[in-house]
A protein has these predicted regions:
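Nucleotidyltransferase catalytic core that binds NTPs
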Residues: 8, 13-220
């Protein structure tokens, strides 16, 4: 194993312990709030890993996503720990605290730039949902995002990504995968209401939510 890497340029960032010191040839990037991570996220990750023939897939919990309201988002440290628990027994997957330790909002272009400096010889595959594709032209420096990575789009229930009017259509990889109708919002509501979330999240994540009082009134 190699210890966490730190590099500084126009962006400041860190990476947690990596399983292998060698640059993966094809690296999947799965960013999100993961508030909390659930079974649907893991199914998507597995499908993308196999269909895109990735060598490694990196989960990156966002600290302060620019397109989401922050009031109902648990502390980044909690969300990072839940991802770590969910994937710790799968050698294909890793989790990074890159965005958690970077000040300010979590912009994709900054994350991909940082990863490009770390893994210059790797091909980056950035995973987004079809709903995000519909608003990608509102992201910071979208043209640069497409220069840094192949954008992999996965289905979302009720969203027809093929109708998206984006000028980068020929740079998008549409990957069919099961449409798993599980949402973090619904999971949070179920916890708040005292309902079961078994099978919606890995059991380690369910235990972590319970032990830390997450998504209850007054929880973190």
């Amino acid at each position: 194993m190699t210890q966490g890497l730190t590099r500084r340029n126009q962006y400041t960032y860190t990476l947690t312990i990596l399983i292998t010191p060698m640059n993966p040839g094809r690296l999947g990037i799965y960013g999100g709030t993961f508030n909390p991570i659930h079974t649907g996220h893991l199914i998507i990750a597995q499908e993308i890993y196999e269909q895109c023939k990735l060598d490694r897939l990196l989960f990156i919990p966002s600290a302060r996503p620019p397109h989401k309201h922050h009031a109902n988002i648990s502390a980044p440290e909690h969300r990072y720990q839940m991802v770590e628990l969910a994937i710790r027994d799968d050698a294909r997957f890793e989790v990074s605290d890159l965005e958690i330790h970077r000040p300010g909002l979590s912009y994709t272009v900054e994350t991909l730039t940082a990863l490009h400096h770390l893994y210059g010889s790797s091909s980056l595959f950035f995973i987004i949902g079809a709903d995000s594709l519909l608003e990608i032209d509102t992201w910071r420096e979208p043209d640069q995002v497409f220069e840094l990575a192949t954008i992999v789009v996965v289905p979302r229930p009720g969203v027809d990504a093929y109708k998206a009017n984006v000028r980068w259509r020929d740079q998008i990889l549409m990957v069919p995968s099961p449409e798993v109708d599980i949402s973090s919002t619904d999971i949070r509501k179920r916890v708040e209401a005292g309902q079961q979330i078994q099978y919606l999240v890995p059991h380690q994540v369910e235990a972590y939510i319970r032990e830390n009082g997450l998504y209850k009134s007054g929880g973190n």
